[in-house]
């Protein structure tokens, strides 16, 4: 990882996602999260990894932050867990205000285009948006990480 100051990773989530059982079996997908966490820890750089909340409930992910689209003014119910390594931060965001029958979900199949647009992923196809996270999540975490890196530079 020479030349990099930090790493963000989003390994595929199908081996932990409950929705996978609707279409087959989670055992049909490799667990890439566990080796990703080991690899990230070996680099010694600050890192962030994202996955479904089930990866924190039933897998190796530690949910340092759980984010929902409604926390960022998006009409989207899209919970994702994030773990940080070699740095940490505490910053409050609005509480999750998702509503089962009002907010858009990725697997409704009738409003998929609206879901992608509501996430802020207007350039993605409907199918791509099913596996994406709202850019607002990465922006929020990336801003915090940039602040951490800048503070490290100042103290060095």
Predicted regions and their residues:
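Class I S-adenosyl-L-methionine
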Residues: 1-7, 13-155
